[in-house]
Structure formats: structure tokens, C-alpha cells
């Protein structure tokens, strides 16, 4: 049985002090959690150390928003896998649409990051995929998304796919207030799961966690999670306040 995985992506919000306050509020309220339910938050790099201390021993796990595929060297502004592990990071988001857009990350670069991360002790790497509004309107959604899946997972073995989470995040629904309908989201999630079966095996397909991301909130989370191939959510704006993030959590568990 696949776990339910809710991840809060805080993007470029909060100083260390601000992030610590919100992290403490969330950790304090989530006192008990079933084994099949996972909650993660990804503060900015500068807040990782303090947030790690705040959630230590709690039911909240620590993630990072990106990383370099290089271990060290002349890579100004980047952060390596080992640096993240030093802070207690267990999960890393890779290939987010904002990184693809603003940092010009290609499928090939994202694949290098996936392969680099798999050489380290992260529990899971979250590979994000999704189409733009123009691509959806042109009927290219599945072609684009499945291509991103295949390229992102290039050279990833059957054993390593167990450490990959996929997140479908339609670019047109991120930060816009627009959300894919449950039917639209389920169609893509189902196609992704079938693609994993083609690339790997039925077992890999049955077990891989596929999240939805795109203006998720307390009002729409339940209907999204009722779909058979949606296993969780990658949550942006609604995860920034403890109250709204906790409402989402409580509407699911």
C-alpha cells in the first residue's frame, strides 16, 4: 500500500527565525501520525539548520528545494548533496517548474541531479513534471509530461526507482489559484503510473508515490486524494501558514 505524502514547499519565503516559528507550530500540532502518512517541509537553504533543530524528534520530515549534481567545486551559489545531508535533509525536490523556468534547468540537468542524489543517503528524491498552459491547450500534456518522466529517470535502475517520488505539477496551476480538476489530475497520474510500468515493472508502478502540485488547499485536497492514482500533494502557498497547512493535513488523515 502506498503512503500518503504531503510536502510543504516554502520556496523563497521566511528568514530562519520566521521559518522556525512556523515549523514549531506545525510539529507541535502533529503529535501522532500513522505509519502510512508522511509530512515534509522544505524551507529555504538558509533556514535548514534552525528548522532541523525545531522539528527534531517530531513527525515532520525535512526536505530541500534543490541541489547541485556536483559534490564540490567552482559552482557559485549552488549547494551540494553532502551539504544538505549535514543539516539532516532526507528529501530533495528536483525539477520544479520554477527551477526549469528561472534557472534554465533542462531534463538532462535534472537527470544528473537525480543520479547524483541516488548516490547519497537521501530517503527520497521528488522529481517534478508538468506542462504549460500552451502545451495543454495544444493537446500535448501527456507527451510533455511522459517525456519529462523518461528523461528525468534516464539510467535510474529498478532498485533505485524505489527512492523516487513523482510530482505532477501543471505549470499553469502553480501560484495562479487555478487547480486541475480531479479528473484532469487523475488522467495524468494514471498515465505516469502506466509509463513507470513500461519503463520498470508492475511492482514499481504499483508502489511509486505520485503527488499532485498546483494551488492545493484545504478545500480541494480531499477530492484530489480520493482519486486512485493521487498519493499526496506538493503544496506551495497553502503550506506557508501553519493553520492552512494543518487544515490540509487534517482533511486527509
Curated annotation (Swiss-Prot):
Its main location: cytoplasm. Pathway: Carbohydrate biosynthesis; gluconeogenesis; Carbohydrate degradation; glycolysis; D-glyceraldehyde 3-phosphate from glycerone phosphate: step 1/1. Keywords: Cytoplasm, Gluconeogenesis, Glycolysis, Isomerase. GO terms for molecular function: triose-phosphate isomerase activity. It catalyses: D-glyceraldehyde 3-phosphate = dihydroxyacetone phosphate. The active site is at residues 96, 169. It is an enzyme of class 5 (isomerase). CDD domains: TIM (cd00311). It is found in: Cytoplasm. InterPro entries: Aldolase_TIM, TIM_sf, TrioseP_Isoase_bac/euk, Triosephosphate_isomerase, Triosephosphate_isomerase_AS. GO terms for biological process: gluconeogenesis; glyceraldehyde-3-phosphate biosynthetic process; glycerol catabolic process; glycolytic process. The keyword Membrane does not apply. Its EC number is 5.3.1.1. One of its GO terms (cellular component) is cytosol. Homodimer. Belongs to the triosephosphate isomerase family. Involved in the gluconeogenesis. Catalyzes stereospecifically the conversion of dihydroxyacetone phosphate (DHAP) to D-glyceraldehyde-3-phosphate (G3P). NCBIfam families: tim. This is Triosephosphate isomerase. The lineage of its organism: Bacteria, Pseudomonadati, Spirochaetota, Spirochaetia, Spirochaetales. The gene is tpiA.
Amino acid at each position: 500500500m502506498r503512503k500518503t505524502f504531503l510536502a510543504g514547499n516554502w520556496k523563497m519565503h521566511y528568514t530562519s527565525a520566521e521559518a522556525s516559528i512556523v515549523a514549531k507550530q506545525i510539529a507541535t500540532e502533529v503529535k501522532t501520525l500513522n505509519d502510512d502518512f508522511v509530512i515534509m517541509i522544505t524551507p529555504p537553504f538558509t533556514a535548514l539548520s534552525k528548522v532541523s533543530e525545531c522539528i527534531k524528534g517530531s513527525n515532520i520530515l525535512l526536505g530541500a528545494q534543490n541541489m547541485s549534481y556536483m559534490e564540490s567545486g567552482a559552482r557559485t551559489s549552488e549547494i551540494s548533496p553532502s551539504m544538505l545531508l549535514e543539516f539532516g535533509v532526507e528529501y530533495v525536490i528536483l525539477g520544479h517548474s520554477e527551477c526549469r523556468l528561472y534557472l534554465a534547468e533542462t531534463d538532462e540537468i535534472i537527470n544528473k541531479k537525480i543520479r547524483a542524489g541516488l548516490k547519497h543517503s537521501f530517503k527520497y528524491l521528488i522529481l517534478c513534471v508538468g506542462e504549460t498552459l500552451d502545451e495543454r491547450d495544444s493537446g500535448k500534456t501527456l507527451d510533455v509530461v511522459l517525456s519529462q518522466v523518461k528523461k528525468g529517470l534516464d539510467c535510474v535502475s529498478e532498485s533505485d526507482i524505489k527512492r523516487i517520488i513523482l510530482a505532477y505539477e501543471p505549470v499553469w496551476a502553480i501560484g495562479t489559484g487555478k487547480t486541475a480538476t480531479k479528473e484532469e489530475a487523475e488522467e495524468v497520474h494514471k498515465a505516469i503510473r502506466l509509463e513507470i510500468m513500461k519503463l520498470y515493472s508492475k511492482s514499481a508502478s504499483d508502489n511509486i508515490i505520485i503527488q499532485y502540485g498546483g494551488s492545493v488547499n484545504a478545500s480541494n485536497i480531499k477530492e484530489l486524494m480520493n482519486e486512485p492514482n493521487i498519493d499526496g500533494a506538493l503544496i506551495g502557498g497553502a503550506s506557508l501558514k501553519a493553520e492552512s497547512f494543518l487544515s490540509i493535513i487534517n482533511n486527509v488523515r
